[in-house]
């Protein structure tokens, strides 16, 4: 199923999924030391030391599935999503139409041909070809472009943009060369309000917008749009029209039969069911998100998360005030950015006033088109609305690298919005319960939120200002020092091994590794200060500090085959679980005292080699 996606390719999303059933039993915040095997030295491998009992229980068994907190919560959440989907009338209609696809093949193909023909009917000029491109975008033909929402920085309202396809060899299906990955739309230059030039008449963009049918005053553009239009204007009209027709046929015929699906995907998929599963996020994701929020509200958990977020923001602010390597100017800019950071938790409180589609369950391609028309209507209803008011709904329709649905088990920070969001699944059982031990809460959810906050100040986040605008707020000297600290973190993580003899990819994971270290420091600082304010000291304080480290270490317990471990490491922006733990604790001074770490231990770092960035 497409819903069980524990890792995301972009937006620097923190994939922490907590399974309370696996946490060490806790009484008065003292970790159960029975799980710690004496033959495992914490200074050599703290991850294994803290997770020894769980790992020992899996010895001798090759996992049938990836195991551990991250994967346990993903599976639990996928089960919830499946229950929601099975009850959805839209999903039932799609299943019914899919089952009847062979019987309705002739009618389905005829419908597709009619749509392609009507889209291009009478088009002979360049201007009419541009309008046809807009109509194809409205229709939802991803090989041409897809329609998305985004926040306009000028007034914090929602606009729309069309996102070009990923580069594929030399050309996209539309015939226009795509020179960069789609996240350039948001990550490299900000999207700006489009202003029509009434003096020079209609432009290429104006004709495309006419075909899309949305008010041009809400359109947002960037350099990629300019490049797209410049290349488009060099292509012959007949070639544009042919490519549009081919793209429409290739997309829609895949819903008509297994043979068409294989033919038009060049064997990448083998059946309509497989094709539907690949496109289900785009077509049905909004409706799953809506029904999921109705079935699994997070009202009871939100007060605890709101309080926790405020505490972690305060903790990081104090750390910024005490920062020793930033100049006063950059330090103040960082504090201002933190003070402006948005905090969002749980189930969306307001949904756009758009009608849900009434699918017939007859022709699959007709139902898919109805879903896409409904998606278009929902985007239209969001335009001009406050981004804050409809956060995080617009993320379902805004995505450089795939939509973020509110049923996903995840949390993320968005640099272009300067806000973080803990999605509902993290606030539901088994990820969170109101009975969760306080130490466990800070070591897990505190670290999670601290991690997301730190993303505002990592290599990418640091290039955006307090308003989410791409703007340099660093002095030259501070930027150089920051680069130096990141290089040290890269070297540190690269010294760890994914598997024996296989070094970690520190440069690939540095953004998440910096956030892991910052998140731990923020949460641990707050926890220790909270204990001291309560008058806890001596051995009791030491035991509660130890418990924090042990709870933290259980967050990333995982059991994967060696092949899966290597395959994941090759593309994942997060380090392997044992590296995320060992690569953090070795930089924390208290860890050395709490667990009697000495210079002879493998994880030992001299005080001057311990890294503190945030």
Write out the residue ranges for each language-model feature.
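Intrinsically disordered, low-complexity linker/terminal regions across diverse proteins
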Residues: 289, 293-614
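Bacterial N-terminal signal peptides that target proteins for export
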Residues: 2-12
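Bacterial Sec-dependent N-terminal signal peptides
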Residues: 23-31
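Active-site-surrounding "flap" and adjacent substrate/cofactor-binding loops of secreted or lumenal enzymes
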Residues: 41-44, 49-112
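Noncatalytic, helix-rich "gating/capping" subdomain that lines the substrate-entry/channel surface
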Residues: 80-312
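His/Glu-rich zincin catalytic helix
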Residues: 32-34, 39-72, 176, 181, ...
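Bacterial N-terminal signal peptides
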Residues: 11-22
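Short coil/turn segments at secondary-structure boundaries
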Residues: 57-62, 94-95, 127-133, 145-153, ...
């Amino acid at each position: 199923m497409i819903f069980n996606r524990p890792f995301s390719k972009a937006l620097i999303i923190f994939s922490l999924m907590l399974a309370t059933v696996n946490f060490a039993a806790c009484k008065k915040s003292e970790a159960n030391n029975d799980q710690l095997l004496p033959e495992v030295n914490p200074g050599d491998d703290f991850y294994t030391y803290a997770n020894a009992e769980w790992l020992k229980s899996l010895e001798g068994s090759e996992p049938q599935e990836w195991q551990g907190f991250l994967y346990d919560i993903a599976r639990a959440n996928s089960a919830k999503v499946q229950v929601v989907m099975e009850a959805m009338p839209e999903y039932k209609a799609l299943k019914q139409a899919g089952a009847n696809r062979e019987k309705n093949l002739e009618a389905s193909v005829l419908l597709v041909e009619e749509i392609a023909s009507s889209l291009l009917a009478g088009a002979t000029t360049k201007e009419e070809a541009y309008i046809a491109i807009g109509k194809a975008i409205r229709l939802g033909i991803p090989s041409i472009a897809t329609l998305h929402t985004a926040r306009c920085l000028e007034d914090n309202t929602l606009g729309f943009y069309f996102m070009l396809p990923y580069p594929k060899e030399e050309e996209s299906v539309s015939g226009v060369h795509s020179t960069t990955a789609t996240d350039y739309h948001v990550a490299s230059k900000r999207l700006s309000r489009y202003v029509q030039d009434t003096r020079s008449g209609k432009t290429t963009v104006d004709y495309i917008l006419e075909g899309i049918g949305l008010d041009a005053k809400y359109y947002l553009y960037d350099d990629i749009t300019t490049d797209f239009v410049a290349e488009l204007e060099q292509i012959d009209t007949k070639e544009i029209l042919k490519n549009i027709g081919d793209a429409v046929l290739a997309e829609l015929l895949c819903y008509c039969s297994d043979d068409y699906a294989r033919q038009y995907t060049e064997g990448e998929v083998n059946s309509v069911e497989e094709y539907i599963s690949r496109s289900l996020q785009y077509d049905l994701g909004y409706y799953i998100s809506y029904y999921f929020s109705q079935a699994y509200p997070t009202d009871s958990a939100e007060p605890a998360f709101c309080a926790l977020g405020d505490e972690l923001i305060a903790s990081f602010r104090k750390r910024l005030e005490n920062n020793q390597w930033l100049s006063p100017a950059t330090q103040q800019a960082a504090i201002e950015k933190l003070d402006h950071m948005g905090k969002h938790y749980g189930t969306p409180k307001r949904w756009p006033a758009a009608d849900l589609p009434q699918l017939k369950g007859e022709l699959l391609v007709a139902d898919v088109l109805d879903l896409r028309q409904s998606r278009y209507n929902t985007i239209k209803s969001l335009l001009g609305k406050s981004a804050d008011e409809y956060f995080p709904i617009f993320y379902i329709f805004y995505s450089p690298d795939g939509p973020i649905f509110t049923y996903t088990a995840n949390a993320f920070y968005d640099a272009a919005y300067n806000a973080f969001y803990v999605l509902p699944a993290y606030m539901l059982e088994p990820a969170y319960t109101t009975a969760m031990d306080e130490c466990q809460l800070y070591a897990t959810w505190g670290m999670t939120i601290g991690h997301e906050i730190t993303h505002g100040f990592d290599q990418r986040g640091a290039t955006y200002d307090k308003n989410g605008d791409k703007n340099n707020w660093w002095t030259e000297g501070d930027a150089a020092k920051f680069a130096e600290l990141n290089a040290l973190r890269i070297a540190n993580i690269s010294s760890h091994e994914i598997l024996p003899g296989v070094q970690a990819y520190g440069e690939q994971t540095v953004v998440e590794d910096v956030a892991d270290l910052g998140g731990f420091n923020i949460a641990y600082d707050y926890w220790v200060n909270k204990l001291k304010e309560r008058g806890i000291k001596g051995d009791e304080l030491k035991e509660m500090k130890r418990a924090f480290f042990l709870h933290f270490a259980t967050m990333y317990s995982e059991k994967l085959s060696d092949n899966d471990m290597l395959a994941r490491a090759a593309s994942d922006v997060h380090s392997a679980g044992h590296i995320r733990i060992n690569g953090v604790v070795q930089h924390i001074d208290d860890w050395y005292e709490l667990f009697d770490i000495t210079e002879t231990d493998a994880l030992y770092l001299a005080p001057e080699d311990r890294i503190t960035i945030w």
